[in-house]
């Protein structure tokens, strides 16, 4: 650049560390707002910039970690959350997020470790207790899973997923009646909850109450037709025994007709926990 041109260039801003951190936190808030509207592609570069401007702020790293996880970049997410945890070791929410990320990585033992550490700092958080139960469930540690689900339900009586998953455990252990009672309770809490409704339908149908089972199955799939997909059920921790019975149930002409009818229906939005 010739000398004249150089004279026209703006002087670089001399920001002190306090001003940089303030700017970083402001950008992080902007990224968080975008994330609330699920605009992750716009939020992510802002969150990355925020960690550069405010590298000693656990908030910026925690936000970046959560965004990486939302966009399924799990390794980057775990690394960012670990950085946040190093900056604020007593923050239970960061440990809970780490536990959730480890679960998604299928590292269930590490998930248990992170969640237990978080619960020591902040006990009786229903979502964390539920996640801990799920990690035990994936390791086939059923008594421990049920204990955590029961704790979660004790903390929040409307928390039907915990009761639902106790039903999943019951069914895999061959306690069909116990599973039916749990799923009935879950549906009584939320009569729009498609998962326990379909599980209950399958259990009733398999037990011999075919008419009630089919009618309930139709209602469940009308609420949310994703539950007609075996892979989706696996993601929701349905075990082998229940999946086998569900496969037979889904292949019945009446349920096949219901699935075809619902195929054109829009999928319900996924609600944030």
Feature names for model-found ranges:
Residues 20-59, 63-73, 100, 104-107, ...:
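Alpha-helical segment of the N-proximal tetratricopeptide repeat
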Residues 122-173:
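Ligand/cofactor pocket segment of small-molecule handling proteins
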Residues 24, 58-59, 92-93, 126-127, ...:
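Helix-start (N-cap) detector for alpha-helical repeat units in TPR-like alpha-solenoids
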Residues 53, 87, 121, 155-156, ...:
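Structural marker of alpha-solenoid helical repeat scaffolds
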Residues 36-46, 70-83, 104-117, 138-151, ...:
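Structural signature of tandem alpha-helical TPR/SEL1-like repeats
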Residues 7-15, 219-273:
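Terminal, low-structured helical/coil segments at or just beyond the last alpha-helical repeat
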Residues 184, 188, 194, 198-229, ...:
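TPR/TPR-like (Sel1-like) alpha-helical repeat modules
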């Amino acid at each position: 650049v010739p000398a004249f041109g150089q004279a026209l260039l703006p002087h670089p801003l001399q920001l002190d560390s306090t001003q940089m951190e303030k700017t970083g936190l402001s950008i992080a808030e902007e990224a968080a707002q975008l994330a609330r509207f699920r605009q992750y592609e716009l939020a992510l570069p802002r969150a990355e910039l925020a960690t550069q401007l405010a590298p000693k702020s656990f908030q910026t790293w925690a936000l970046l970690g959560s965004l990486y996880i939302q966009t399924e970049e799990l390794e980057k997410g775990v690394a960012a959350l670990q950085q946040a945890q190093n900056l604020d070791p007593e923050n239970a929410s960061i440990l809970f997020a780490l536990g959730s990320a480890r679960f998604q990585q299928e590292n269930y033992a590490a998930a248990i470790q992170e969640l237990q550490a978080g619960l020591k700092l902040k006990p009786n958080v229903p979502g964390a207790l539920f996640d801990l139960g799920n990690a035990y469930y994936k390791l086939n540690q059923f008594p421990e899973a049920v204990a955590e689900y029961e704790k979660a339900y004790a903390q929040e009586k409307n928390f039907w997923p915990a009761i639902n998953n106790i039903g999943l455990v019951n069914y895999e252990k061959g306690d069909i009646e116990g599973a039916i009672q749990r799923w009935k309770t879950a549906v009584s809490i939320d009569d729009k909850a498609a998962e326990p409704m379909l599980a209950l339908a399958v259990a009733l149908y398999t037990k011999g109450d075919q008419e009630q089972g089919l009618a309930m199955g139709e209602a469940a799939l009308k609420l949310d037709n994703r539950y007609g997909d075996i892979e989706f059920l696996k993601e929701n921790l349905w075990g082998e025994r229940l999946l086998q019975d569900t496969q037979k149930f889904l292949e019945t002409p009446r349920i096949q007709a219901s699935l075809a009818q619902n195929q054109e229906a829009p999928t319900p939005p996924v609600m944030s926990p």
